Amino acid sequence: MIGLVVILILLAAFYGGSRRGVALQLVYSGGFFLSFLVAQKLFLPWGERISLLLPYLSVSPDTKMALFTQEQSFDLDKAYYAAVAFIGFLFIGHLLTKFLGIFASGLRYTRFIPQVDGLIAGFLNVIIAYIWIFLIFKLLTLIPLDAIQGLFKAGSVPRWIVEKSPLLANYFNQMWIIDLI
């Protein structure tokens, strides 16, 4: 079921991007990746600050984490706060980009290569949507609730996305798990 939802989100993202056209989608994509770089620089100090404001569920010796060992699960609060800070900065930057994109809406009708303009723009938007899906699933892996951890049982789509996504899986595992725990 979750796999179907992911596919529908990616199809909707492709449709939205292809309707925008490459010129406008490049504005949105550039803003997203600029926000990504800002979030990458700021998430660590802010992750420590929000730990005082945002509660993290306590991990008990009986807690079963789908993707982490028992030892790692006791230190996942650091990774959780870092992930929340990163996603928060990325979300704020994405909203600012969407707002600024309103002023660039005239680019919607600018076509670089009319034959493939929609395909390129749709593909760019799918990449952004996939990154969001990955980040949400990665954040969920850090929450020690059985119902949420059940989403990541062996062979599930969310688990595959979190573990096997090219570039993203290793990058965020290094940034949020290995470097912090």
Kindly label every feature range from the protein language model:
Residues 1-181:
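Alpha-helical transmembrane segments and their juxtamembrane interface "caps"
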